[in-house]
Amino acid sequence: MLMPKRVKYRKQQRGKMRGKAKGGTLVHFGDWGLKALEPHWITAQQIEACRIAIMRTLKRNGKVWIRVFPDKPITSKGIGVRMGKGKGDVEGWVAVVKPGKILFEIGGINDELAKEALAYAATKLPIKTKIVPRYEIGGEL
């Protein structure tokens, strides 16, 4: 599972997800990319499920780039624990994804197989996504 090796602070505040993605909005490495259209927290398990789905479709051909990394700790208190007494323990890690962010890239295979793999990976995510080519002319997102 993806997670940071070490962090400066164990716990973070939740924060807001306003606006569009500042960086990582263009396909740089591969020929096709999967672009997020909604803001959401993507968990490490969801990223891994997408990676496995893509690899199964590609059957060891081509190359995959994962453009998001879960670096935000998510905490929760145990069931039946009363309020107060400090923040809960770290339960997992998420990547903060804003609209326009490229999540995955695929290269080195034909276009039909790349689109099929990314469409299958998109079913594993809780957000709306769009398959984009390397060079997309026009369009805000």
UniProtKB/Swiss-Prot annotation:
PROSITE patterns: RIBOSOMAL_L16_1 (PS00586), RIBOSOMAL_L16_2 (PS00701). GO terms for biological process: translation. Keywords: Ribonucleoprotein, Ribosomal protein, RNA-binding, rRNA-binding, tRNA-binding. Pfam families: Ribosomal_L16 (PF00252). One of its GO terms (molecular function) is tRNA binding. Belongs to the universal ribosomal protein uL16 family. Part of the 50S ribosomal subunit. This is Large ribosomal subunit protein uL16. It comes from Kosmotoga olearia (strain ATCC BAA-1733 / DSM 21960 / TBF 19.5.1). The lineage of its organism: Bacteria, Thermotogati, Thermotogota, Thermotogae, Kosmotogales.
